[in-house]
């Protein structure tokens, strides 16, 4: 493609958002810190909608946030179904393609199915932890 906006552009990394996702995000109660962390994660998204997690201290140094704030923001992003732990990769988060996606748009359904599987496992584990805590009290 040649034209005004394509001259000399090489290997641009990008992600897209959906209008549905943007509308849902506007209705959340995410904090400024949550959004800051989200955009940090999006700046590191790969074509599979994954983000390899650096340790919280390094992330904190990059975006000027404490480890505690990062942990809270990750919990908030999970609670709002924006991210989930990738069940196939260690130290990796998966971004919900309903909100943001990278790579081929033709794989959105496949990515959404995988996110749903990851998120279900997160909910199942959360439920087990709640049940275990009730049983120990």
What is each model feature region?
Residues 1-11, 126-137:
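N-terminal intrinsically disordered, low-complexity, charged/polar
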Residues 1-50, 54:
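Short recognition helix of helix-turn-helix/winged-helix DNA-binding domains
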Residues 15, 36, 57, 98, ...:
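Intrinsic disorder/low-complexity detector
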Residues 19-26, 82, 100-104:
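Short alpha-helical interface patches
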Residues 33, 44-101:
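Winged helix-turn-helix DNA-binding recognition segment
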Residues 41, 85, 132-134:
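Short secondary-structure transition/capping segments
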Residues 100-130:
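Short, amphipathic alpha-helical interaction segments positioned at domain boundaries
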């Amino acid at each position: 493609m040649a034209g005004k906006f394509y001259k000399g552009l090489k290997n641009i990394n990008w992600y897209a958002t959906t209008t549905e996702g943007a509308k849902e995000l506007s209705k959340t109660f995410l904090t400024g810190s949550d959004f800051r962390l989200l955009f940090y994660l999006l700046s590191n998204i790969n074509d599979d909608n994954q983000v390899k997690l650096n340790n919280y201290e390094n992330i904190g140094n990059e975006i000027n946030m404490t480890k505690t704030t990062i942990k809270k923001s990750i919990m908030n992003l999970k609670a709002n179904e924006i991210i989930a732990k990738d069940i196939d990769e260690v130290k990796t988060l998966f971004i919900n393609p309903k909100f943001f996606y990278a790579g081929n748009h033709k794989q959105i359904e496949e990515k959404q199915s995988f996110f749903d599987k990851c998120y279900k496992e997160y909910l199942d584990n959360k439920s087990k932890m709640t049940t275990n805590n009730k049983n120990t009290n």
